Amino acid sequence: MIMVQSTFQLNPESKNSVMTLMKEMVGLCREEHGCISYEYYEGITDSCQIILLQEWENADCLQEHYRTEHMADFLEKLSAFLKTPVSTRSYVSEESKISAPTINEKRKPEQTIH
């Protein structure tokens, strides 16, 4: 599974336009092959900070997503509303490593998230 986290800051006057754009994008992306989840959130202390979280079955599905017409259209429209560049991080998770360990596996220490 591939997880993608994108964060960006909006110009305050563009927030309503971007929320409409984001809702459209979520609907389109959730229909794509390999999309497990596609969600966006506003910052708690700054409602102009947007965090986009995506989960994809694999890298091929994510690359297909990047090549869609609606992705190109979204990025073109979004760029006019940004106060800061988009910051993106990607993570890979193997399903077997996040499931419960078998009786013969030693449990790794819990990871602390900051």
Task: Give, region by region, the residue ranges found by the protein language model.
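An amphipathic, aromatic/His-enriched active-site/gating alpha helix that lines ligand/cofactor pockets
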Residues: 24-37, 55-89
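Short alpha-helical
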Residues: 13, 45-47, 69-73
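Intrinsically disordered, low-complexity acidic/polar segments
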Residues: 15-17, 61, 97-99
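Short, well-ordered beta-strand segments in beta-rich or mixed alpha/beta enzyme
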Residues: 2-8, 39-66
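Generic alpha-helical hydrophobic packing signal
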Residues: 3-9, 18, 49, 53-55, ...
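N-terminal first-folded block
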Residues: 2-40
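Non-catalytic surface loops within mature trypsin-like serine protease
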Residues: 10-12, 58, 92-95
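Glycine-rich beta-strand-turn "strand-cap" elements at beta-sheet edges
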Residues: 40-46, 76-114
